[in-house]
Amino acid sequence: HQNEKALADHEATFDERFVHWSQSAETGTSWEAMDIRSVSASNDTKLVLQRDSVIQAEGKLGKTEYVVLGKAGGEALRAIRLEALIHDTLPKNGPGRADDGNFVLTEIEVRWAPDSDPDAWKKIKLHKPQADFSQQNFPVKNAIDGNKSGNNGWAVSPQLGQYHSALFELNEPIVSDESYQIEIKLTQHYQGNKYALGRFRLSITSDEGEIDLGIPLTIDSILALSADERSDEQQQSLKTFFEGRDKQLLQLKKALEVAKKPRPEDPQVTKLKARLELVSQPLP
């Protein structure tokens, strides 16, 4: 009962904490959706650019490379964020195309070229990778280690059917007075052949100092509205997102689950039951 009470007490303050958070949300690094000019994929996979810079993968499953070409310029570009998004058209809601909703990002590569010399591509080194979650043996640092073999990369099992994000800082920021093209290549060569991203979005930041994953662009745009401008659906999206970030709530739920698990029966009791059953059987 102690665990149930702790959970109930915590849930009772949910509305108060939620309102406080939604009014003064510390959103961290400010991310901006990439201005995308074209998307393509190898191996008969089709990438479809949707609104809000969301990219959805369709068509044939297989080892593939996604190439996203965008435009940038003005402020220095310091980091790139990849959001892995869920959707009901994907197996188990995704965010990957594998049967269980997983994906394996083998490698992410970035290069850029100034508009005045569009063939003068310069490769950019990435470092300081971060992710909200990494599968055991598939840490996010694998996505920038240069190894494109079939069992290496960033993946997110068992946290499937959930939003995930990763960021990669540029070794040296791109600083250009004129606008330029930026190309991001996502290689997905996992040996299972199905482990590609199903739905994703790329964002960039020019923030200086410590860079963090920030919050999803969709949540960011809802937070920009005042409470009475938000639809019920938008308000619910905020609540779901806030719940997912409530570490204490997750810990309390876990403690309650553990407490509710039936305890294994004492072997002596099991033996006694078996003997009683024998004794109580009618004689022939």
PLM regions with names:
Residues H1-P284:
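Low-complexity, glycine/serine/threonine/alanine-rich intrinsically disordered linker
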